[in-house]
């Protein structure tokens, strides 16, 4: 299965970060949680999470996807990290999957990855992005770029990442009762 890195910055959105990690691990992928500047990262609702590693010491080998959860100011911390910007550009050029949800597309914008791409984000965040084409969809896929609009999009966002990594998510969706959400 694939190797995925999910980056966490202080005051991240817990649903977007933790549910994405959970779903990708359930799908059989190896998911590394990597904190910016700290081994313990606290989310916007005061949930503290111990990371697998920190950005400064993480070993970058055989990575298939990079994922950025949103939340503010967590997404701005991601955007403002020069080393992370370098890695986003590098892995995009390698043809790897890059995914961001909620406010985190501002980091993709700073890295120049939204140019000529369709994307979605939390409503209003698009006003700070002058690249690409904002769609407002729940989840948007443009090549190897995957974006989600916010907390309610997290499950679909994570399933979409898993599918882009080659996983058939139909049994996982059924087992997690996700399909029942779509039935009225």
Stretch-by-stretch model annotation:
Residues 3-6, 12, 26-36, 53-54, ...:
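Active-site-adjacent pocket-lining segments in enzyme domains
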Residues 34, 39-45:
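Membrane-interfacial amphipathic helices and adjacent loop/beta segments
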Residues 45-53:
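Short gly/ser/thr-rich secondary-structure transition/capping motifs
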Residues 19-20, 87:
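Hydrophobic residues within alpha-helices
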């Amino acid at each position: 299965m694939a190797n995925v890195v999910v980056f966490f910055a202080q005051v991240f959105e817990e649903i977007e970060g933790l549910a994405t990690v959970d779903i990708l691990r359930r799908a059989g992928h190896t998911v590394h949680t990597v904190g910016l500047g700290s081994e313990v990262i606290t989310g916007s609702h005061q949930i503290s999470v111990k990371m697998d590693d920190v950005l400064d010491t993480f070993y970058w080998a055989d990575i298939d996807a990079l994922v950025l959860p949103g939340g503010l100011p967590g997404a701005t911390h991601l955007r403002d990290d020069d080393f992370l910007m370098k890695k986003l550009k590098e892995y995009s050029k390698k043809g790897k999957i890059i995914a961001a949800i909620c406010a985190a597309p501002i980091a993709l914008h700073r890295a120049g990855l939204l140019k000529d791409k369709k994307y979605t984000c939390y409503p209003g965040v698009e006003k700070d992005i002058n690249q690409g084409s904002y769609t407002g969809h729940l989840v948007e896929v443009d090549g190897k770029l995957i974006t989600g609009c916010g907390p309610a999009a997290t499950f679909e966002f994570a399933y979409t990442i898993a599918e882009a990594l080659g996983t058939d998510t139909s049994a996982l969706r059924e087992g997690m009762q996700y399909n029942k959400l779509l039935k009225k």
